[in-house]
Design a protein with these regions (language model features):
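Short, strongly hydrophobic transmembrane alpha-helices
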Residues: 91-117, 121, 388-391, 433-438, ...
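Membrane-helix entry/capping segments
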Residues: 49-92, 124, 151, 180-181, ...
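Small-residue-rich transmembrane alpha-helices
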Residues: 356, 394, 430-503, 540-543, ...
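Alpha-helical transmembrane segments of integral membrane proteins
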Residues: 62-94, 363-367, 396-423, 427, ...
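Structured, solvent-exposed hinge/loop segments at the ends of secondary-structure elements
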Residues: 3, 33, 46-52, 56-62, ...
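Conserved positions within well-ordered secondary-structure segments
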Residues: 515-904
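Negatively charged linear elements and acidic catalytic determinants
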Residues: 1-98, 314, 343-348, 356, ...
Length: 904
C-alpha cells in the first residue's frame, strides 16, 4: 500500500513539510559550521546561525505560498485554529452564536413566509409559461368589469370562445373562482352521522393538463368527464386524501358522497399541489359540467353575463405576452358585441373593457396583495434586529481583541503579516456566522410554522408551505456572510493593525484604547438609534391595534355566537328551506340561555358580501355614478341577535312574507348616500332594474359588517321570506357566555338535518379578534423584535461599559487616590453612558417618524409622530440603559486605589 501512503502524503503535504524541515536544518547546520570555522564558540554557533539565516517561520510561510493548494490549506488551518479558540472560550462563543442565531433566524423565518406567499412558483411543469387572464377576484366575490374596465373574471361562454379561437396558447383552462363548502362521505363505509367540511372547485377537464400536474394515484380528468351527461367524477388533493381518508389507496375508483350526491374518485394530486390560489388550499376538484349538481344552484354554463371563472393559459414557446393580450382582447370585444346591452351606457362602457394578461408562474392570490406591505415591514424589522445583533457581537469581538492583544503581537513578531492576521480573524467571524446561521435555520423553521398558524386571511387560515428551498437557503447564507462583514470586519481590521514594538510592552493594554473607545461609543449610539426606531414602530402598531379593538363597530360583540352552516348541502330549493329555517330558529331560541337567534346570508366580518345596483324611482343615474350597494337577506330577529341598533322605523316582522308589501331595511350610509336625509322611512327604490319597488320600513345604525378597516358602505337588508335565499350564518345572542352554547347549537342543527356541514363555530368577540389577525400578527412580532432589541442594547451597553471600566481601572484608581468619591465615580460612568443613550434617542426619533410615514396605511387613529408612543419608547430605552449601566458604574466605584496604582 505504499502508493496509497504516497497519495495521502501528496494531498496532506506531509512529504513536502518533511523535505522543507530537512532542508532548513541542513542550511542551519552548514551555517553553524561556518560560524565555528570563523571563530564562534560551539555553544553560541547555533544561535548565530539562526540570526544569520533569518526568520525561520517567515521562510516556511513564503515557501508554502509557492506550493499548490495553498489557499485551501490555509483556510483549513484558519478554521481549525478558530475552532480551538472558540472552544477555549465557550461563554463568548455561546453568547455570540445565540445572538446571531436570533438575528439570522428571524430574518430567515420572515423571508420563508415572504418567499412562500410572494415569490414561490406553483409546483407545476414550466410555470414561467403560465399566464393569468386577469388577477381573479381577490375580494372573494364574483366580479365583472372592474375599474378601470379590466375584466377580473370570465363567464363560461367567454371561456369557451377564448379557447375555441386560441392560436397563441398551448391550451387554456378555467376554474371556479371561489371555493364551495362540500360535505364529504365515503359511500361504501358506514357514516357516523357527522359531516366533514371540505373546500372544492369546479374546473375544466384540461385543468391539470394545462398546469402539467400528473396524478399521484389514478388519473386526472379526461375530456369526456366534462361532456354533457358524463358520470360525476372527482379528483382529491394529496393532503385531503391523507387527512380525511388516511391515504387509503383503495379510495381510487370508489364512490364518495359530495353534498349527498355520488361521485367517483378518479385520481389523487401529487404532494404539495393544492391548486392555483396561493394561500387557499383546495381539497377536491370536479369538472365544470358538474356545476349545478356540485354547487346546488342553477346552471352558470349558459349565461354570458355571469362572471365566475378565473382563467389560466399556457403560452406557446416564443409568443410575446403583448401579442397574446392583443389577440385575447379582439376575441373579448367580438364576444361582448354579441350580448344585447342592458342600456346605451353599458354599450359605451363595453368598449373600454379588456382582459389584462399577467404572468401566472405564482398563481392567483389575494393573500399576496393583502400581505405584501406587512411582510415588507416585518422584513425591515428583522433587518434592523440583525444589525443590532451584529453590533452586539462586534462589541464582544472588540472586548475579546483587547484580551488577545499580546497574542496578535507575538504572531506578528513571528512573521505573520497583517493580511494573514486579518484573514484569521475574519475566518473566526465566518465560523461564528456559520454556527449562528445553522442555529438560526432551526429557529426559523419553528418560527415560520408558528407564523403560518397565526396568519389570517379574512377569517380563514392561510395555507402555504414554508419548507426551506434553494432561495431561502441562499438568503440564509447571504445573511450570514453579511453578518460576518458587519460585525467582524472592523474589529479584525483594528486588531490586525497593532504597533508591534509598543504592543509587546507590559502596559500595552492601553494602546489604541482611545480609538477603540470612540468606535465602541459610535456603535452604542447606532444601536440605541435602531432600537428606538424599532420600539416606536412596534408601539405605533400596538396602539393602532388597540384603537381597532376599541372602535365603535356598530354592533354589540358581547354574548354572541356565530355558526357557519352549508345551506347548499341541505339539498332543498330556497323556498322549501324557509320551513327548515323557521324550525332551526325556533328550536335554537328555545335553548336555555338564548335570547335571540337570527339567520343571514353573509356572516359578520367574513369579508364576503353580495352587491347590486339599485334604481331610484324617477331617477336616472348620472354617467359614471356608483349605484352599487351591499345586499343581505336576513330573518326577523337578526338585528337583535347581532346587536345592530334600529335608528328609525321598525324591524322585520314574522308577517313580512311573500304576500305582504315588499320591504327593506337600510343603513344610515345608504340614507345619506342616495336620499341625502336620515328620514327615509316610506321611501322606495328597486334592488335591480328588473325587480319590484321596495319600501324602506326601517333604518339601522351603520355597522362594520365586512371588515373593521372597511369603510361603511350602503347596505340593503331584505327579509328572506319575501326573497328566498340560501342562508349560511346563524347568529345567537346569549344571556351569558355564548361559548357554552356551541355544543347545544351544533347538536340542534344536526338533529334537524343530520348531514348539514357545520363550519366555524365562534363567538363574535373571537371573530373580531380573528378579523384583526394581520394587525395582531404584525403588532406582536414587532413588539417581540422591539423587546429583543432592548435586551440586546442592554447587554451591549453592559459589556461595553464593563470593558471600558476594566481598561480605565488605572485612571479610576488615580481619580480616587486624588480624592474622588465613590458616588462621583459612579456618576461619571453613568453620565457617559446616558449621554450616549440620549444621543441615540435624539437620532432614533426622527428616523422612527420618517419610517412611520412609509407605513401610514397600517396605522389606525394615529400619526407617525404620535407623542405618547415617542415618549414611551424613549423612556423604555432610557430606563433599560440606566439599569444596564448601573452595574459597571458600581464596579468602577469599587476599584481600590492601591490595586490600580500597583500597575503604574
Amino acid at each position: 500500500m505504499a502508493w496509497w501512503r504516497s497519495m495521502i502524503d501528496r494531498i496532506t503535504r506531509r512529504s513536502n513539510e518533511r523535505d522543507l524541515d530537512r532542508e532548513i536544518r541542513a542550511h542551519l547546520e552548514m551555517e553553524a559550521e561556518e560560524q565555528i570555522e570563523g571563530g564562534q564558540a560551539p555553544a553560541e554557533a547555533p544561535y548565530a546561525a539562526r540570526r544569520a539565516f533569518g526568520n525561520v517561520t517567515l521562510i516556511q510561510e513564503v515557501t508554502r505560498e509557492m506550493w499548490g493548494w495553498n489557499s485551501a490549506e490555509r483556510l483549513w488551518q484558519d478554521l481549525r485554529y478558530a475552532g480551538r479558540t472558540l472552544r477555549k472560550n465557550p461563554v463568548f462563543a455561546a453568547t455570540a452564536i445565540a445572538t446571531l442565531a436570533l438575528g439570522i433566524g428571524a430574518n430567515t423565518a420572515i423571508f420563508s413566509l415572504l418567499n412562500a406567499v410572494m415569490l414561490q412558483s406553483l409546483p407545476v411543469r414550466d410555470p414561467a409559461q403560465l399566464v393569468l387572464f386577469g388577477e381573479g377576484s381577490w375580494e372573494g366575490a364574483n366580479a365583472g368589469p372592474a375599474e378601470p374596465g379590466i375584466l377580473w373574471l370570465d363567464s363560461y361562454p367567454l371561456y369557451q370562445r377564448l379557447r375555441a379561437q386560441n392560436q397563441l396558447f398551448e391550451d387554456i383552462a378555467a376554474q371556479q373562482n371561489n371555493t364551495s363548502g362540500v360535505n364529504v362521505e365515503w359511500a361504501s363505509r358506514p357514516s357516523d352521522g357527522t359531516a366533514d367540511f371540505a373546500s372544492g372547485r369546479c374546473v375544466s377537464a384540461n385543468y391539470f393538463d394545462v398546469l402539467g400536474v400528473p396524478a399521484f394515484r389514478g388519473r386526472a380528468f379526461h375530456p369526456d368527464d366534462d361532456a354533457a351527461g358524463a358520470n360525476p367524477v372527482v379528483v382529491l388533493s394529496y393532503g385531503y386524501w391523507q387527512r380525511r381518508f388516511g391515504a387509503n389507496p383503495a379510495l381510487v375508483n370508489e364512490t364518495v358522497m359530495l353534498n349527498g350526491a355520488p361521485y367517483t374518485v378518479v385520481g389523487i394530486t401529487p404532494p404539495g399541489f393544492t391548486g392555483t390560489k396561493i394561500g387557499h388550499a383546495t381539497d377536491l376538484w370536479v369538472p365544470l359540467r358538474m356545476q349545478p349538481r356540485f354547487m346546488r344552484k342553477e346552471s352558470f354554463l349558459a349565461d354570458g353575463r355571469l362572471w365566475w371563472l378565473s382563467v389560466i393559459g399556457r403560452l406557446k414557446p416564443c409568443v410575446p405576452l403583448a401579442q397574446a393580450q392583443a389577440s385575447v382582447n379582439v376575441t373579448l370585444q367580438q364576444f361582448l358585441s354579441e350580448i344585447p346591452p342592458a342600456s346605451s351606457q353599458e354599450l359605451v362602457d363595453r368598449r373600454a373593457v379588456r382582459i389584462e394578461l399577467l404572468p401566472g408562474a405564482r398563481g392567483f392570490s389575494g393573500v399576496r396583495r393583502l400581505f405584501a406591505m406587512p411582510l415588507a415591514l416585518l422584513m425591515a424589522g428583522v433587518g434592523v434586529l440583525l444589525m443590532i445583533a451584529c453590533v452586539n457581537v462586534c462589541h464582544l469581538l472588540l472586548a475579546r481583541a483587547t484580551r488577545r492583544h499580546r497574542e496578535f503581537s507575538l504572531r506578528m513578531a513571528l512573521g505573520a503579516s497583517r493580511a494573514r492576521l486579518l484573514r484569521q480573524l475574519l475566518t473566526e467571524g465566518l465560523m461564528l456566522s456559520a454556527l449562528g446561521g445553522a442555529a438560526g435555520v432551526l429557529i426559523a423553521w419553528w418560527l415560520a410554522q408558528g407564523l403560518v398558524r397565526l396568519a389570517d386571511y379574512r377569517g380563514a387560515a392561510v395555507t402555504v408551505v414554508v419548507t426551506p428551498d434553494a432561495r431561502v437557503i441562499a438568503l440564509t447564507a447571504l445573511v450570514a456572510l453579511a453578518a460576518t462583514v458587519l460585525f467582524g470586519l472592523a474589529p479584525a481590521w483594528q486588531s490586525s493593525g497593532i504597533q508591534l514594538a509598543t504592543a509587546l510592552k507590559e502596559s500595552a493594554r492601553g494602546i489604541t484604547g482611545g480609538f477603540r473607545r470612540r468606535f465602541s461609543r459610535m456603535l452604542l449610539v447606532f444601536q440605541v438609534t435602531l432600537s428606538v426606531a424599532l420600539l416606536v414602530g412596534a408601539g405605533l402598531l400596538v396602539r393602532s391595534l388597540e384603537n381597532l379593538k376599541n372602535m365603535n363597530k356598530g354592533f354589540d360583540e358581547e354574548h354572541v355566537l356565530l355558526v357557519e352552516i352549508s345551506s347548499r348541502s341541505i339539498g332543498l330549493a330556497p323556498e322549501p328551506t324557509l320551513a327548515l329555517y323557521d324550525e332551526l330558529i325556533s328550536r335554537v331560541t328555545a335553548l336555555p340561555g338564548v335570547r335571540f337567534a337570527g339567520l343571514s346570508r353573509t356572516s359578520l366580518l367574513s369579508g364576503n358580501t353580495s352587491t347590486s345596483d339599485i334604481v331610484l324611482p324617477g331617477d336616472m343615474p348620472a354617467r359614471g355614478e356608483d349605484m352599487e350597494v351591499q345586499v343581505d337577506w336576513v330573518t326577523p330577529a337578526y338585528f337583535d341577535a347581532v346587536g345592530i341598533p334600529l335608528a328609525r322605523g321598525r324591524r322585520f316582522l314574522p308577517a313580512d312574507g311573500a304576500d305582504s308589501p315588499k320591504g327593506a331595511i337600510v343603513n344610515e350610509a345608504m340614507a345619506r348616500r342616495f336620499f341625502k336625509t336620515a328620514d327615509v322611512v316610506g321611501r322606495r327604490f328597486r334592488n335591480d332594474p328588473s325587480s319590484k319597488d321596495l319600501e324602506i320600513v326601517g333604518v339601522v345604525k351603520d355597522a362594520k359588517v365586512v371588515g373593521l378597516r372597511e369603510e361603511v358602505r350602503p347596505i340593503v337588508y331584505v327579509p328572506v321570506r319575501q326573497s328566498p335565499q340560501l342562508l349560511s350564518s346563524l347568529s345567537v345572542r346569549a344571556t351569558g357566555d355564548p361559548g357554552s352554547l356551541a355544543s347545544q347549537v351544533r347538536k340542534t342543527i344536526l338533529d334537524i338535518r343530520p348531514r348539514v356541514p357545520v363550519g366555524q363555530v365562534a363567538t363574535l368577540r373571537a371573530r373580531v379578534e380573528q378579523s384583526l389577525g394581520q394587525e395582531r400578527l404584525i403588532a406582536e412580532l414587532s413588539s417581540a423584535f422591539g423587546l429583543v432589541a432592548l435586551l440586546l442594547v442592554s447587554v451591549g451597553l453592559y459589556g461595553a461599559l464593563s470593558q471600558q471600566v476594566a481598561q480605565r481601572s488605572n485612571e479610576i484608581g488615580v481619580r480616587m487616590a486624588l480624592g474622588a468619591s465613590r458616588g462621583g465615580v459612579q456618576w461619571m460612568v453613568l453620565r457617559e453612558a446616558l449621554m450616549l443613550v440620549l444621543a441615540g434617542i435624539a437620532l432614533g426619533i426622527p428616523l422612527a417618524i420618517a419610517a412611520g410615514r412609509l407605513v401610514t396605511g397600517l396605522l389606525f387613529g394615529l400619526k407617525p409622530a404620535d407623542p405618547i408612543t415617542l415618549v414611551a419608547a424613549s423612556a423604555a430605552v432610557l430606563a433599560v440603559a440606566t439599569l444596564a449601566a448601573y452595574v459597571p458604574a458600581r464596579r468602577a466605584s469599587s476599584v481600590h486605589p492601591m490595586t490600580a496604582l500597583r500597575y503604574e
